[in-house]
């Protein structure tokens, strides 16, 4: 029975790996027991597309392994969230902790290591690079 519960928990986690929208904000952010990393983007933004590719190919899976929800939000389709987070430039990333505290707001594309180390911080672990060399 324990393994079935694990599978059900995993299924819920995977079901929530989706685009953050004006409509599902409550479900993903307010009801989440894990920190959430949000990437606000525009489909017409070149640097945003680079970050989206990183999220889709590697960062989302890494976040899941570390217990951090990684989501994206298209500001052109979600004006309420863009307004609530006062988005003026993209890409804009921010973390929402379990208690809904906002941390680590960043505008612009950072290097890949930055995002992996931020996931580590949110998970309460040492840096990604330090774990590679120990």
Predicted features by range, described:
Residues 26, 79-82:
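Short hydrophobic/charged patches on amphipathic alpha-helices used for structural packing
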Residues 1-15, 57, 126-134:
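N-terminal targeting signals for export/organelle localization
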Residues 44-51:
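Short, thiol/selenol-centered motifs that function as redox-active sites or metal-ligating centers
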Residues 19-21, 40, 52-59, 64-80:
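Thiol-based oxidoreductase modules, predominantly thioredoxin-like and allied folds used
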Residues 84-88:
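A short glycine-leucine-enriched loop at secondary-structure breakpoints
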Residues 16-30:
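Short, charged low-complexity linear segments at domain edges
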Residues 31-43:
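Short active-site neighborhood of thiol/selenol oxidoreductases, capturing the structured segment around
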